[in-house]
Regions:
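A short helix->beta-strand "capping" segment at the edge of beta-propeller domains
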Residues: 1-17, 50
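A structural motif specific to WD40 beta-propellers
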Residues: 7-9, 52-55, 97-100, 145-146, ...
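WD40/WD-repeat beta-propeller blade N-cap
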Residues: 12-19, 58-65, 102-109, 149-157, ...
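Loop/turn segments within WD40 beta-propeller blades
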Residues: 22-31, 68-74, 113-121, 160-170, ...
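Conserved strand-to-loop turn within each blade of WD40 beta-propeller repeats
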Residues: 37-40, 80-83, 127-131, 176-179, ...
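WD40-repeat beta-propellers
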Residues: 43-47, 86-91, 134-138, 182-186, ...
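Blade-level signature of beta-propeller repeat domains, shared across WD40, Kelch, NHL, RCC1
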Residues: 291-328
Length: 328
């Protein structure tokens, strides 16, 4: 007998707008939290024990918020809005105030990427005012580090990912562009290391596994493209995954490197084994495009969750493949 189709263990309602981005914070303190940000400029901080919004933070002048994250420094939230601002929030002791902001000048949908370089210090990468440029600054000082502009015409920057390699200097940055290209940048040298043409359409999203030096990207078409870095930091295209329906908003790899989730324009979340890209499950609940997916960072593997946020203004939470299942 085939397994019954999975259902959400619960859903969160009341966000009041399309759910563009999700971020878990479950490893510190007693209360596991999920941050969601909407197209109406609201950030909901959901208490996963009570399954209710503990707090609602309004920002970015009501403009759509496209990215949220937390910094290691306690109670510091960072958000990016379509008002061309990145805001740093102090959420300690019941506060919800913007303590600093960065003007990006970008009107696109490219989400920022943040990398902790030392305790209390981060690098922040974001799409700049010019179509193809990526700017990187240090936080909290806001000192400019570099501006990365490709030599060839690749169109608008669509998605970026900062990461720190285990060996050699760093950090490095992966970027997907409007013409379907992926570029790997050396931030320190401000130079392009390699490129690959991963898609015929714009790269809508990418995610990267620094331990395995392997990544995957999606676009508006029916194909996910997987790729890897060799020892010389050359991008090498690997297998493609053909989807039933076109369009992927976001991709996410679980922290243990076993699962990959995709947010589909067809209202579905698809789950694959990350090792061999074996299809494992199709999660059907939402009534509109799924815009975001995130795996929780619980320390206990049995508590791990997958969250999906949709244009239908709901967040679904799922518990899947937590007990050593063969994910392939």
């Amino acid at each position: 007998m085939s397994r019954p189709a999975p259902t959400p263990i619960y859903t969160l309602r009341g966000a009041g707008g399309p759910l563009n981005t999700l971020h878990f914070s479950c490893h510190g303190g007693d209360t596991p939290l999920l941050y969601s940000a909407s197209g109406k400029g609201a950030i909901h901080i959901w208490n996963l024990n009570t399954r209710r919004a503990e707090r609602i933070v309004e920002g970015h002048s009501g403009n759509s918020i496209i990215w949220v994250s937390t910094l290691q420094a306690a109670h510091t939230l960072i958000s990016q809005g379509r008002d061309m601002q990145v805001c740093l929030w102090d959420l300690s002791e019941g506060r919800s105030e913007v303590v600093d902001s960065v003007w990006t000048g970008s009107v696109g949908f490219c989400q920022c990427s943040v990398l902790e370089t030392s305790p209390g210090n981060q690098l922040l990468a974001f799409a700049g005012q010019q179509t193809e440029e990526i700017k990187i600054i240090e936080l909290p000082s806001k000192t400019p580090v570099c501006t990365l502009v490709p030599d060839a015409k690749v169109g608008m920057v669509m998605c970026i990912k900062l990461w720190q390699p285990d060996s050699g200097p760093g950090p490095l940055l992966l970027a997907g562009y409007e013409d379907g290209s992926l570029l790997l940048w050396d931030v320190t040298q401000r130079s392009e290391l390699s490129r690959a043409k991963a898609h015929p359409e714009p790269v809508m999203c990418l995610t990267f596994d620094p331990e395995r030096l392997r990544g995957i990207s999606g676009s508006s078409e029916k194909t996910l493209s997987s790729w890897m870095l060799d020892r010389q930091n050359n991008l090498q295209l690997q297998d493609d995954v053909t989807l039933v329906n076109a369009g992927v908003s976001q991709l996410c790899i679980r922290g243990d490197g076993k699962l990959l989730a995709s947010a589909g324009w067809d209202h579905r979340v698809r789950v694959f084994g990350w090792k061999k890209l074996k299809p494992l499950a199709v999660l059907q609940y939402h009534t509109d495009m799924v815009l975001s997916v995130a795996f929780s960072d619980h320390q206990d593997p049995r508590q791990r969750l997958l969250a999906a946020g949709s244009k239908d203004q709901r967040v679904s939470l799922w518990s899947i493949y937590n007990e050593g299942a063969d994910t392939g």
